[in-house]
Amino acid sequence: MESFEELEKLLDYSFKNKALLTEALSHPSLRQHHEYKANKDYERLEFLGDAVLNLIITEILFNNFKEYNEGNLAKIRSYLVCKETICVVGAKLGLKNYIIMTHGEEIAGGRDNPNNIENVTEALIAAIYLDSDITTIHNIIGKLWAEFIKVKDLTDYDPKTALQEWAQSKDHHIPIYRLIKREGVAHLSTFTVSVKINGYEQTGKGHSIKEAEKNAARELLHKLKLL
């Protein structure tokens, strides 16, 4: 497991209360085994972090996308706070290397479990918020999510809706999605989905069917040169 100091460097933030950082990185499996002597895990912080992330992302969108109505803002926010996006942020921070977990959870693939990455990312957000203030966590989230906020088009945020709206505008049938393949086991699965519309077809992969469908739709939109 990597040192917490390395994570703080990546975040460009040093915790005043190191116990909050430890709590944010502690998997619930620790409390089920007395030998680890853990009395806290990340679950409560995850609950708070989810709310903090939604608030900050909402404020960023409100201030930076003045041309969009509330419906479009909601679509963008949904993309920015979804499991897939949060997991990408967590992966770029290398959070799997910092999670404190039992040996059993580790050998079961816990470090690569998207649920764990998502939960720890949200817990870390809450820990920073509690350790500092709303301005500090606002700046950190702004940096971590910058590449996702700056995509060029609304269709990038919601490719499935964009593809369906295009089909309807051309009087085509609605897109048909089909699961082609599932690889891996349980929480480490990779799904391959195809999307077909009026003779055009493209595939996409993801760690959930929903993510794979979005990626397939995005690829087909690119193929149709709509993005």
From Swiss-Prot:
Pfam families: dsrm (PF00035), Ribonucleas_3_3 (PF14622). Its EC number is 3.1.26.3. Gene3D superfamilies: 3.30.160.20, Ribonuclease III domain. One of its GO terms (molecular function) is double-stranded RNA binding. SMART domains: DSRM, RIBOc. GO terms for biological process: mRNA processing; regulation of gene expression; rRNA processing; tRNA processing. It catalyses: Endonucleolytic cleavage to 5'-phosphomonoester. It is found in: Cytoplasm. One of its GO terms (cellular component) is cytoplasm. The active site is at D50, E122. Residues 158-226 form the DRBM domain. Mg(2+) binds at E46, N119, E122. Homodimer. Belongs to the ribonuclease III family. Digests double-stranded RNA. Involved in the processing of primary rRNA transcript to yield the immediate precursors to the large and small rRNAs (23S and 16S). Processes some mRNAs, and tRNAs when they are encoded in the rRNA operon. Processes pre-crRNA and tracrRNA of type II CRISPR loci if present in the organism. This is Ribonuclease 3. The gene is rnc.
